[in-house]
Amino acid sequence: MTELGAVDALAASIPATPWFTRVGQPLSDSDRANVTAYVAALDLPAGPVEPVGTWKEASRVAADPDWDRRWWQAEAREQRRLQAWAEERHGTEATLTALTHVTEAALDPTRAAAEAASDEALSKVAAGAAAQACHLAALALAAGKPSHGFVIKHRIFAAGRWPLGRVGERWYLF
């Protein structure tokens, strides 16, 4: 399968993905391993992976003033790097067309799944995070990096979870 073919396959898989179906459930060894692999792939500090039990607790973690911004910064750096690689491989127009297709495919399914949050603002944040994970995974695939950390992050979301980030020394997974 070509790189852009892999992006198309990702887009086609989005409607059947069980978005947010395992939030609040106990973490499995696989959940912890995926978070650990994702963190390592972005060259971020390791730490214990803590479960988040409720949408209310997820809101608190996401809004915590001690939330570690290095995660966001590492993702932004990687996104710029992968964008350049993908455009070099496929051209700007083909890359943007493929990424737009994935983003559009993600909007409705992620939004509908995130409605489980009783807080409308949190629901929008959750849906946006899931759609962004799709976009980033597509970018990694388009750049020819099928085992990139962004693909791992998408795997976490596709397993029904939401990685909320790092607060203090801990990584939180809903």
Regions found by a protein language model. Name each.
Residues 1-174:
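Short, glycine-biased loop/turn motifs at secondary-structure junctions and
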